[in-house]
């Protein structure tokens, strides 16, 4: 189910903001360090799809659902052989409709968009963690920018282990049990 999000109305009063319902999150990109999502708006055709900054959105379930699919797609790309079969090549040469060309350009652009560590930014700290995508993911804050990306914990463990350790240390709690305190007092009294 879509959620409402603010989007400026195309009216003469630029201060008015209306709320529209997001039907689906279609893609993700980072522009100048800011995460944006390509949205399909409920009740509007695909030609009205827009890129919206993450901070303007109020649809965490749809974003989470998209990230699950995105992660699976990324893993699939890494496991796919690079060569295409001859039949696939022929098939793609015959599909030249405007829609096919548009969707091909969108796919090419989305594949070129760097995400997470691919952006080449230096990690500053981990803001939070989630397993909503099936694997443990960290919300990584980058140095010299206000932006953050979800990154695989496995990747963060290798690329910035000290930041991962600091994240866990900040959340580490010790539980003292009354019997432990009594035993320590007895040992101290004996010495």
Curated annotation (Swiss-Prot):
Localization terms from the record: Nucleus; Chromosome; Chromosome, Centromere
PTMs per UniProt: Phosphorylation of HP1 and LBR may be responsible for some of the alterations in chromatin organization and nuclear structure which occur at various times during the cell cycle. Phosphorylated during interphase and possibly hyper-phosphorylated during mitosis.
Region (Disordered) residue spans: 70-117
A GO BP annotation: negative regulation of transcription by RNA polymerase II
Modified residues (N6-acetyllysine): 40
Residues modified to Phosphoserine: 11-14, 92, 95, 97
Annotated GO CC locations: chromocenter; chromosome, telomeric region; heterochromatin; histone deacetylase complex; histone methyltransferase complex; kinetochore; nuclear envelope; nucleolus
One Pfam family of this chain: Chromo
Residue ranges of coiled coil: none
PROSITE patterns, per database record: CHROMO_1, CHROMO_2
Alphabetical list of SUPFAM superfamilies matching this protein: Chromo domain-like
Substitution effect: residue 173 to D/K: Abolishes interaction with NSL1
Effect seen on changing residue 165 to E: No effect on interaction with POGZ. Abolishes interaction with TRIM28, CHAF1A and NIPBL. Abolishes interaction with NSL1
Function: Component of heterochromatin that recognizes and binds histone H3 tails methylated at 'Lys-9' (H3K9me), leading to epigenetic repression. In contrast, it is excluded from chromatin when 'Tyr-41' of histone H3 is phosphorylated (H3Y41ph). May contribute to the association of heterochromatin with the inner nuclear membrane by interactions with the lamin-B receptor (LBR). Involved in the formation of kinetochore through interaction with the MIS12 complex subunit NSL1. Required for the formation of the inner centromere.
The protein's name: Chromobox protein homolog 5
């Amino acid at each position: 189910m879509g959620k409402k999000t603010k989007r400026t109305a195309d009216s003469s009063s630029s201060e008015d903001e209306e709320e529209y319902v997001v039907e689906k999150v279609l893609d993700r990109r980072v522009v100048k360090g800011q995460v944006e999502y390509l949205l399909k708006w409920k009740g509007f055709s695909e030609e009205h799809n827009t890129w919206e900054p993450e901070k303007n959105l109020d649809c965490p379930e749809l974003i989470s659902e998209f990230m699950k699919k995105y992660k699976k797609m990324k893993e699939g790309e890494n496991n796919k052989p690079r060569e295409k079969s001859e039949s696939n090549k022929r098939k793609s040469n015959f599909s030249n409709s405007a829609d096919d060309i548009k969707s091909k350009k969108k796919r090419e652009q989305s594949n070129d968009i760097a995400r997470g560590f691919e952006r080449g930014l230096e990690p500053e700290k981990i803001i939070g963690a989630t397993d909503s995508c099936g694997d443990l993911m960290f919300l990584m804050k980058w140095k010299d920018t206000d932006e953050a990306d979800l990154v695989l914990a496995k990747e963060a463990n290798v690329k910035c282990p000290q930041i991962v350790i600091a994240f866990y240390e900040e959340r580490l709690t010790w539980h003292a049990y009354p019997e432990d305190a009594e035993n320590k007092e007895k040992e101290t009294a004996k010495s």
